[in-house]
């Protein structure tokens, strides 16, 4: 069985180490802070053998160099080679990546950046989604277009509903405030926000989050819902998504 070690990193990132006890392999999922990853791996008695980057932003790939120099880890990264260096294998939608006997499917989730990918391990029921989707939110649309981003979110929506989404940031409390503004009549959302508030008061993480719950509460995954279309407009889901994203940007 795969082991996941999650820890806070930088100001609001989460670090993830994915470990296969049988093979001894350990993957660093993104690298906000290489030294912190090495410290956490040492404390667990693990050696980082691979780095799986989701996109090029420094708070996701900035620690690659430190980890590679310390461990010789192999870097697996999306097709953003002009913005990343030292990549051992470039992967894109439809490719697979192995850790021990487990296989991760690479999914195109571009929109936040044009090469953003996620890693879905169906046998383990988990997905590492970077900044594509958050609990009650999604990433800013820095490089992509609304249709592109909505198509990416639709691929996430199509995963098994029990999938646990490992998002890269603790943004949930702020996302919750906009979600309630966007979808105030959603009873499931109101109940979820109460849980989130209690967790954050106890300084507990709200990540991972289950896809099933996000499908019922996350406005960015529900841009095809008639209630949100009526409130936010749009003749197609990606247009409603664009309105929601702009609303969040200015909230």
From Swiss-Prot:
Annotated Zn(2+) 2 binding sites: 59-60, 131, 169
- Which Cys pairs does UniProt list as disulfide-bonded? none
**EC category:** hydrolase
Q: Which GO terms describe its biological process?
A: methylglyoxal catabolic process to D-lactate via S-lactoyl-glutathione
Database matches in CDD domains: hydroxyacylglutathione_hydrolase_MBL-fold
- Top-rank taxon of the source lineage equals Bacteria
What Enzyme Commission number(s) does the record list for this chain? 3.1.2.6
Q: Which Gene3D superfamilies match?
A: Ribonuclease Z/Hydroxyacylglutathione hydrolase-like (3.60.15.10)
What are the transmembrane regions?
none
InterPro entries assigned: Clx_II_MBL, Glyoxalase_II_hydrolase, HAGH_C, Hydroxyacylglutathione_Hdrlase, Metallo-B-lactamas, RibonucZ/Hydroxyglut_hydro
Q: Give the pathway annotation.
A: Secondary metabolite metabolism; methylglyoxal degradation; (R)-lactate from methylglyoxal: step 2/2
GO molecular function ontology, one term from the record: metal ion binding
Q: Which UniProt keywords apply?
A: Hydrolase, Metal-binding, Zinc
Co-factor requirement: Zn(2+)
The note describing how and how many cofactors are bound reads: Binds 2 Zn(2+) ions per subunit.
Q: Which reaction does it catalyse?
A: an S-(2-hydroxyacyl)glutathione + H2O = a 2-hydroxy carboxylate + glutathione + H(+)
Pfam families associated with the record? HAGH_C, Lactamase_B
Which residues participate in Zn(2+) 1 binding? 55, 57, 112, 131
Protein task = Thiolesterase that catalyzes the hydrolysis of S-D-lactoyl-glutathione to form glutathione and D-lactic acid.
Family from the record:
Belongs to the metallo-beta-lactamase superfamily. Glyoxalase II family.
How is the quaternary structure described? Monomer.
Q: What is this protein called?
A: Hydroxyacylglutathione hydrolase
Q: What is the lineage of its organism?
A: Bacteria, Pseudomonadati, Pseudomonadota, Alphaproteobacteria, Sphingomonadales
Gene name, Swiss-Prot/TrEMBL: gloB
């Amino acid at each position: 069985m795969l082991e996941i070690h999650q820890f806070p990193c930088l100001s609001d990132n989460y670090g993830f180490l994915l470990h296969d006890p049988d093979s001894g392999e350990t993957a660093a999922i993104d690298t906000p802070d290489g030294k912190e990853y090495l410290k956490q791996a040492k404390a667990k008695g693990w050696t980082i053998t691979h780095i799986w980057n989701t996109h090029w932003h420094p708070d996701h790939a900035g620690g690659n160099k430190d980890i590679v120099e310390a461990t010789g880890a192999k870097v697996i990264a999306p097709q953003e080679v002009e913005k990343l260096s030292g990549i051992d294998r470039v992967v894109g939608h439809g490719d697979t990546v192995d850790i021990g006997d487990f296989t991760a499917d690479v999914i195109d989730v571009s929109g936040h950046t044009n090469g953003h990918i996620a890693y879905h391990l169906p046998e383990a029921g988990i997905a590492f989604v970077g900044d594509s989707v958050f609990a009650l939110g999604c990433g800013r649309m820095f490089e992509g277009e609304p249709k592109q981003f909505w198509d990416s979110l639709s691929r996430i929506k199509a995963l098994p509903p029990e999938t646990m989404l490992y998002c890269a940031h603790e943004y949930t409390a702020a996302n919750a405030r906009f979600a309630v503004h966007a979808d105030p009549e959603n009873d499931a959302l109101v109940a979820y926000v109460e849980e989130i508030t209690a967790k954050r008061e106890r300084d507990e993480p709200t990540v991972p989050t289950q896809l099933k719950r996000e499908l019922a509460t996350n406005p960015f995954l529900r841009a095809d819902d008639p209630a949100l279309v009526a409130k936010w407009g749009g003749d197609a889901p990606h247009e409603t998504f664009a309105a929601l994203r702009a609303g969040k940007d200015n909230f």
